[in-house]
Every structure is written in C-alpha cells, then in structure tokens.
Regions:
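Conserved ATP-binding/catalytic segment of the ANL
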Residues: 254-321, 338
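C-terminal boundary motif of the adenylate-forming
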Residues: 300, 339-348
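Conserved ATP-binding loop and adjacent catalytic segment of the adenylate-forming AMP-binding
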Residues: 176-180, 194, 198-266, 274-278, ...
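Conserved pre-ATP/AMP-binding loop-to-beta segment of ANL
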Residues: 1-13, 20, 46-52
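Conserved AMP-binding A3 loop
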Residues: 9-35
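Conserved S/T- and glycine-rich ATP-binding loop of Class I adenylate-forming
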Residues: 8, 14-17, 53, 58, ...
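Conserved AMP-binding/adenylation subdomain of ANL enzymes
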Residues: 32-52, 59-151, 162-164, 171-182, ...
Length: 348
C-alpha cells in the first residue's frame, strides 16, 4: 500500500526538561506539507543549486531533521558537522553559504572574537565596532505597520497568508552611521566575518532563544540571520522570519498552513499542518496537551497587529515576586548570556 500523509513517519522524543521525555508522533504529512511550502517561502535557501548548507545540529533534533529533509529534496549541497569544536575548520573546508546553528555556537564565535581582542585599545576597538554593527542592524530593520485582520488569522490553517513587508523598509542608516560602519568593518568586523567563511550569507538560528544584542551584531556584519520558533510537537519551525521582514525580538510569522492565537492566560496555542497528532502511547498526556484542536505550547507569547510572534517566556518558569508581579527569567538570561565571562546562566 502507498504511504499516506496521515501515516506515522517517526517518533521524536522531547528533551524532558519539564518532566519525563515523551515520544512525539510525527506523520509524513507533518514533514511533507511544510516542506512544499518552504520552496516558495525560502527559495534561495532551500532550492538554489548554488547553496552550500552546513548543519551543526544533530539530526535527532527535530529542527535539524526538518531542515535536512528540505535541503536533501532541494538542489544545493548539504554537509554535516558532528562536533562544534571543529566549527572553524569545517567552515574553512566546506565554505558554506548557509549555517544551521544553535545560539550557543554564535555566542562562542562572538566571545572568542572579544577575548582575542582582549583589553586595552584592541578591546575598546572591538566594543566600538560591535556597537556600530548593532546600530547598523537596528537602522536596517523593517518598520511595523498594521495589516488587515485576515493577515493575522485566516479562516483556516491552510489559508493563513504571510505578510509582505518588502515595500516597508525603514529610512535606513544615516550617512554618519554608514561611515562609522565602514571604518568598523575595515578594522574589526571583516575579521569576524572571515571566520564564518567567504561565501556565507545566511545563518538560521534555532533550538533556543537568541539574545537580541547577538542577533543585531551578526546582522550588522551583513549576514542574513533568520530566527524561528518551534517544538518537537510542531515538526520544528512553526514560525520563521524572512529575509524581507525581521523586526526586533520577533521569531517571525506562522509557517504557511499553520495558525496561532494567544490564550487568556498568555499561552501560545497553535494548529495546522505542522502540528503533531499526539504522544506515543500516552493518551492522557495527548488529551491534556490539546484544547479544542489547538496545541498548548507552554510558552508565553504575544502577536502584534502585523502577525509577528514574540516569545516572552515559559508558562511554568514564571517567577512571582513578593509584590505579586510575574517575571520571566529568560529576559534576564538572554541579556547576560553574551558576556564573555559567562558560559552558562540560570536566573532563579
């Protein structure tokens, strides 16, 4: 018998950070349907014969699995690096046009460059150049403007359109900022970019939140940085930024064929072609994870009037202060994670 879209394709286990690992059942349709959308959504990354993609995430990770399938079905060349300790050598050998990494890899590259600069004049020069890179990124971001309600939540999971911001650029960097950027590039930024290879134009960051300062630094290098959001239960990315639209703090728009909404308590709910049908041999956990056909992600989020998704924390990790205020520790952790003296951080 022919394989059908609704047939089970694989079981990927959750990390177990919030309890015992659960086997997420993903169907062939969970992979194939979003993949077909990817060729239109991100054609230069997925279906360009000149693309050379280097993956640092293990393919046991759902994001790496999904991206691998997309790339193998496309026209480019795909390579895998089993150990991030070989990052620089693998990049130098393969000369990728695209990297798939976790934020920790990006932190290591940044911290290594800062440590190499050291203190004194070189250290101050690196800090100044990094500041110019972030300023260039912020000045080149795209301006939010309201879209019709239908662009935020369509009538069904297969009709949610993706907003087009290509006609809404910001005023751009000033002449003075451009001049400072050229000086910063000549003195520092070009050397950091050289570590990432001569052909690199895109980095896809996933698997964990990326600090905003770090995102702006890499974009200021002239690299297209795409962030997304997803879980094992959503077959990896259920929202993603596009090269035309990447506002600060956002993790993009719903992947075509999916919908999102915010519950009264602030939790993000999702449904659509990417969402798993449940957990393997765990009917009670499956029933608890869904409400009226919507999957409860466990993440706190907001969606602006243009459909940009922003993740603000985990529902179970909120810290309640003595004054009764709810505080998400992730905001503090992200702001501190780029410090060169900090390898790992947790706010309790």
């Amino acid at each position: 018998d022919a394989v059908k879209l609704g047939d089970e394709a694989t079981v990927i286990y959750t990390s177990g950070t919030t309890g015992m690992p659960k086997g997420v059942v993903l169907t062939h349709g969970n992979f194939i349907s979003p993949m077909l959308q990817a060729y239109d959504f991100l054609p230069l990354l997925i279906n360009d014969p000149k693309s050379r993609s280097l993956l640092f995430l293990p393919v046991a990770h759902v994001l790496a699995r999904f991206v691998m399938y997309c790339l193998l079905a496309g026209q480019g060349i795909t390579a895998f690096s089993p150990d991030t300790r070989n990052l620089v050598n693998d990049i130098a050998t393969f000369k990728p046009t695209m990297l798939l990494v976790v934020p920790r890899v990006m932190e290591k590259v940044y911290n290594a460059a800062a440590a190499k600069a050291g203190g004194g004049m070189k250290g101050r020069m690196f800090a100044w150049a990094a500041k110019q890179a972030r300023a260039l990124s912020k000045a080149s971001a795209y301006v939010d403007s309201p879209l019709p309600e239908s662009a935020v939540a369509g009538p069904g999971p297969d009709t949610t359109p993706i907003p087009d911001a290509s006609a809404m650029p910001s005023p751009g960097p000033s002449t003075a900022l451009k001049l400072r950027g050229r000086v910063a590039d000549a003195l520092v930024l070009s050397k950091v970019r050289a570590i990432l290879g001569p052909n690199l134009h895109t980095i896809i960051s996933g698997g964990a939140p990326l600090a905003l300062d770090l995102a702006n630094f890499y974009r200021g290098l002239g690299i297209t940085l795409l962030q997304g959001y997803g879980l094992s239960e959503t077959t990896g990315p259920i929202s993603v930024e596009t090269p035309q639209d990447f506002p600060p703090d956002s993790v993009g728009f719903p992947w075509p064929g999916n919908r999102m909404k915010i519950a009264p308590d602030g939790e993000l709910l999702v449904q659509g072609i990417s969402v798993s049908k449940g957990y393997h041999n765990l009917p009670e956990a499956t029933a608890e994870a869904y409400v009226d056909g919507w999957f409860k992600t466990g993440d706190l989020a907001s969606i602006d009037d243009r459909g940009h998704l922003r993740i603000t924390g985990r529902k179970k990790e909120l810290i309640v202060t003595a004054g009764g205020k709810n505080v998400s520790p992730e905001v503090l952790e992200e702001s501190l994670s780029t410090h060169p003296l900090i390898a790992n951080i947790i706010v309790v």
